[in-house]
Amino acid sequence: MSLVYLLIAILVIMAMILLMSKRRALAKYAGYIALIAPVISSIYFMIQIPSVAKLQYLSTSIPWIKTLDINLDLRLDGLSLMFSLIISLIGIAVFFYATQYLSSRKDNLPRFYFYLTLFMFSMIGIVLSDNTILMYIFWELTSVSSFLLISYWYNNGDNQFGAIQSFMITVFGGLALLVGFIMLYIMTGTNNITDILGQADHIKNHGLFMPMIFMFLLGAFTKSAQFPFHIWLPRAMAAPTPVSAYLHSATMVKAGIFLLLRFTPLLGLSNMYIYIVTFVGLITMLFGSITALKQWDLKGILAYSTISQLGMIMVMVGIGGGYAQHQQDAIASIYTFVLFGALFHLMNHAIFKCALFMGVGILDHEAGSRDIRILSEMRQLFPKMNLVMTIAALSMAGVPFLNGFLSKEMFLDALTQTGQLSQFSLISMIAIVFVGVIASVFTFTYALYMVKEVFWTKYDSKVFTKKNIHEPWLFSLPSLILMVLVPVIFFVPNIFGKGIIVPALRAVSAGNHQIDQLAPHVSQWHGFNIPLLLTIIIILLGSVLAIKVDWKKVFTGKIRQISVSKSYEMVYRHFEKFATKRFKRVMQDRLNQYIIMTLGIFMVIIGYGYIRIGLPKVHQLHVSEFGPLEVILAIVTVTIGISLIFIRQRLTMVILNGVIGFVVTLLFIAMKAPDLALTQLVVETITTILFIVSFSRLPNVPRSNANKKREIIKISVSLLMALIVVSLIFITQQTDGLSSISDFYLKADKLTGGKNIVNAILGDFRALDTLFEGLVLIITGLGIYTLLNYQDRRGQDERE
């Protein structure tokens, strides 16, 4: 099955979900219909594992906009396969979990599952894209679908603010990324990613290389919640827990990392890129791990935990980027090891973090709270979630016999080897190791502290009242399956390493097959070495801090109020006030003012073009023959048009406006264009009647008195616009030896079977344009109808 067919299949499922929204009896099954999408994609991508391992990559290219080199280019290599498997397999768990989490009585299920499937479609589109513009389209689609999912419970103010904040930050990064893609096109002349990476040595010497890197980093850092753009992720936790488990731990937040990995053969040629990514990753890792201890909401803890873990992966992506410069050197094995660790931890993090979010969701759903100050001794009420969250949290902390331990060891090993790399000195290595270890200590602390507070703190009936709480098996099943994978991967890591991670490494290295020999063999025991010593230190210090310190009392008062998010809110409020003032100044409910502004901008653009290029010489001028009748009709049209400016009665204005149209009809007849005359007559008659009929539904608001200054502006704009239109007509008549498109229509109109060139153009040559013009009118009408029938939707949260 082609990659295009897979995407089409997902779109068909989305259409089925939309159809179910019209039938309440079927709406409750929307989740199970939506579940088909990740199941199909998972089966499809798992079937491709052997082929991709043998370098048999799938690719599809469908021309779209050839002149701009924008095509539907899709490519399935090792890197896109690994991410597609994560998106699809985690998707199965999340979609099934959502069927148990959401209520068919209280929630609009088809709407939710449509948004969730749209997001999955967008993420798969990102990782399969082999065209930069196509990737950007899918990139922004993830922002849109994320906005819709976060604001799913739209009556909640936190959901609305979180959705807007995440949308603004990620779209800002997306626009920066688009600028980077445009720079790449300027440097290479192509939008095809495979071709771009093949020109890496040429691009690195271009003047736009460094600006392009900064644009890429803005896109990646905003999407993957890196400091200081991390602030949207905690706010996004207002979304339903299935959304948090899928978007904000396993998939969407990994899109920025995917971007950097995909372009590592190009970006890694710059040492500045390596330094920035490594530094930002370390800061993010440290900041996230410390801030997680300040949270009382379990989802808040997991949000900052995700930020910290993403920073950890980003550090390895940054250090490993040097592989692009040293593919043939002896130290290439170190870079390969670091990149392998980044991919390995990316996979591990998706598993244990998704399990943690699901566990928190079950606690919230059944116990009614996520506050660690309220929840206590939950191991008795939720034995399965005690097991799931304990194992997943310990894996995140890097405890032995769990998958997180292996990738955490690789991370520490990578940090200790940076001193051997040309980009880092001994002092910088010590600083990197120090920050990495401190961040890891706090990671261990909040992971253990979270489990201790929720499941092992002594029960206090004054704080939390035990209710009829149950722990359904179907609800717990997805998290239990993910929990089982945590120790399984520890004992058989190389099954995943050789089948999934090594092919992904090939893609990161731009197809260098030597990387197969350089890829590490993951062992559970490496003997006593520096990374193991650092792990022991982390476990000891983290255990002491988690058990002996009451972090609920540490971060209080002013310390707790320090937040980067507050800076964002302050800037947001100022921009909002500024926009409100500008809006009130511009939007004064005067349609003619809006038209003047629109035409004014158009005239400025045309005028600027005339100034830059200059007016062409008019050496030929074609003017149709005209007689006294045409002159009289033209004078009548102009006279009525000018009189409309000074007339105050609405009905008179409408009638005179119709008269202008009928005079133009006579002008067409005089010019021997009967078809145009008939069309003009019909349109003018219908619009005039509609105008008059609409008066019965419009308020009787008298028109303001004539203002001499305002009327002069209107006349001036009209005359200037007429002058520009006439000048453009003259310019188009100067062929300069080039063939005109009119000649094509004149010669080819007989092929359409039409007897009139105008009909042939409207009905055949630009039939799609005519069709879409009609669709635009229909959509506009539906929009107006919706606004007229809009009722303020207020009420309680849909969960209640």
Swiss-Prot record:
Main location: membrane
One Pfam family per UniProt: MbhD
Transmembrane segments: 1-21, 33-53, 78-98, 118-138, 167-187, 213-233, 241-261, 273-293, 300-320, 331-351, 387-407, 424-444, 472-492, 527-547, 595-615, 627-647, 651-671, 676-696, 712-732, 768-788
Keyword Acyltransferase (UniProt): no
Keywords (A to Z) from UniProt: Antiport, Cell membrane, Ion transport, Membrane, Transmembrane, Transmembrane helix, Transport
Top-level lineage group: Bacteria
Membrane topology: Multi-pass membrane protein
Subcellular location field: Cell membrane
InterPro entries: CPA3_Na-H_Antiporter_A, MrpA_C/MbhD, MrpA_C/MbhE, ND/Mrp_TM, Proton_antipo_N
Entry's Gene Ontology BP terms: monoatomic ion transport
GO CC terms, sorted: plasma membrane
GO molecular function terms listed in the Swiss-Prot or TrEMBL record: antiporter activity
Entry similarity comment: Belongs to the CPA3 antiporters (TC 2.A.63) subunit A family.
Known partners and oligomeric status: May form a heterooligomeric complex that consists of seven subunits: mnhA2, mnhB2, mnhC2, mnhD2, mnhE2, mnhF2 and mnhG2.
Protein name in the entry: Putative antiporter subunit mnhA2
Species this protein is from: Staphylococcus aureus (strain bovine RF122 / ET3-1)
Lineage: Bacteria, Bacillati, Bacillota, Bacilli, Bacillales
The encoding gene: mnhA2
